[in-house]
Amino acid sequence: MEIHLESQEQEMKYQSQIWNQICGTVDTSVLRCAIQLGIFDAIHNSGKPMITLTELSSIVSSPSSSSIEPCNLYRLVRYLSQMDLISIGECLNEATVSLTGTSKLLLRNQEKSLIDWVLAISCEMMVVVWHELSSSVSTPADEPPIFQKVHGKNALELAGEFPEWNDLINNAMTSDTSVTKPALIQGCGKILNGVTSLIDVGGGHGATMAYIVEAFPHIKGAVIDLPHVVEAAPERPGVEFISGDIFKSISNADAVLLKYVLHNWEDTECVNLLKRCKEAVPADKGKVIIMDLVIDDDDNSILTQAKLSLDLTVMNHGGGRERTKEDWRNLIEMSGFSRHEIIPISAMPSIIVAYP
């Protein structure tokens, strides 16, 4: 049966929406290109609130070392403007460009930057797996994720073999930590009261733990991760690094931190890991602190859309899942904890505290 649309105006709205979704990969490609060219940094490092397009074209450089074509640069900047990442103006009949509040999260050498997340998510090794999403939808939870079928090994195994991939992953996690740091420290204030030792399970290069021991110097901090991760980790004051398999052994501490770890696994693996964490903390006053996404299926905000995008990413690339409040309740109860609380913070993840 033919569907009759309400009006020409409504039909154009529907067509525009579909065309934007058809070309959805353009957003990621443009974002990656802008970072590779150094567009945001060029504007910021100029020391001026805005620069002309001519100035920008003389500053930025392509990875191939070839010169920039001003007309093509303008077309790229025009699209970045539609993404609210660049503001286009005019001065003395010449186009000018300036940063927006959003693009300030895409600068290098800043306290808050998501550049490394962009580069990791948009790299060829990640992008090629999206072509197999339909296969991922039909893959049972007990089978390897599509990433492993495409590349022959899972992401962690590849990280152990290829230093550049290992750096890409860990730099992305450090990048996320830089953005969530203020909310994390604020949200953990009461939670860490009375905690003298904390171990970050799967804590990568230790950026999160470094922030915590700096904010709470009374805490003895440690990070446990795979040997190839620990070997590449930089020295951090007040942070001890431990090589090991988090599914086999976790050192004892007053509290355990799991930041963006459980979303990489299905429930069975998560329960096993949470039980290990429960054994590592005191039964009377121990805490297992989880930083992970909490999805609200009834919320249609841009934040929820971002969370759902990450849910499909971990499904397709890692074989894990993002979880709702009910999912977290069931998971924590299955792991034998007596109670838990979910604390929203001003960041993508929430803080979930499980008590033995």
Swiss-Prot record:
User: Which residues of this protein are catalytic?
Assistant: H263 (proton acceptor)
Q: List where the protein spans the membrane.
A: none
Binding residues for S-adenosyl-L-methionine: M173, T177, G202, D225, D245, I246, K259
In alphabetical order, the GO MF annotations are: (S)-scoulerine 9-O-methyltransferase activity; O-methyltransferase activity; protein dimerization activity
Binding-site positions, substrate: D176, Y260, V261, L262, H263, N264
Catalyzed chemical reaction(s): (S)-scoulerine + S-adenosyl-L-methionine = (S)-tetrahydrocolumbamine + S-adenosyl-L-homocysteine + H(+); 3-O-acetyl-4'-O-demethylpapaveroxine + (S)-S-adenosyl-L-methionine = 3-O-acetylpapaveroxine + S-adenosyl-L-homocysteine + H(+)
Query: Is S-adenosyl-L-methionine found in the keyword set?
Result: yes
**GO biological processes:** alkaloid metabolic process; methylation
The protein's UniProt keywords, in alphabetical order, are: Alkaloid metabolism, Methyltransferase, S-adenosyl-L-methionine, Transferase
Q: Name one Pfam family in it.
A: Dimerisation
Enzyme category, top tier:
transferase
Q: Which InterPro entries does the record cross-reference, listed alphabetically?
A: COMT-like (IPR016461), O_MeTrfase_dom (IPR001077), Plant_O-MeTrfase_dimerisation (IPR012967), SAM-dependent_MTases_sf (IPR029063), WH-like_DNA-bd_sf (IPR036388), WH_DNA-bd_sf (IPR036390)
- Record has ATP-binding as a keyword: no
Tissue distribution of the protein:
Highly expressed in capsules. Expressed is stems. Expressed at low levels in roots.
Q: In which pathway does it act?
A: Alkaloid biosynthesis
SUPFAM superfamilies named among the record's database cross-references? S-adenosyl-L-methionine-dependent methyltransferases (SSF53335), Winged helix' DNA-binding domain (SSF46785)
Q: What is its EC number?
A: 2.1.1.117, 2.1.1.352
Biological function: Methyltransferase involved in the biosynthesis of the benzylisoquinoline alkaloid noscapine. Catalyzes the conversion of (S)-scoulerine to (S)-tetrahydrocolumbamine. The heterodimers SOMT2-SOMT3 and SOMT2-6OMT convert 3-O-acetyl-4'-O-demethylpapaveroxine to 3-O-acetylpapaveroxine, where SOMT2 is the catalytic subunit.
User: Assembly state and interactors?
Assistant: Homodimer. Forms heterodimers with SOMT3 and 6OMT. The heterodimers SOMT2-SOMT3 and SOMT2-6OMT possess 3-O-acetyl-4'-O-demethylpapaveroxine 4'-O-methyltransferase activity, where SOMT2 is the catalytic subunit. Homodimer does not possess 3-O-acetyl-4'-O-demethylpapaveroxine 4'-O-methyltransferase activity.
Which family is this sequence assigned to? Belongs to the class I-like SAM-binding methyltransferase superfamily. Cation-independent O-methyltransferase family. COMT subfamily.
Q: What is the protein's name according to its record? A: Scoulerine-9-O-methyltransferase 2
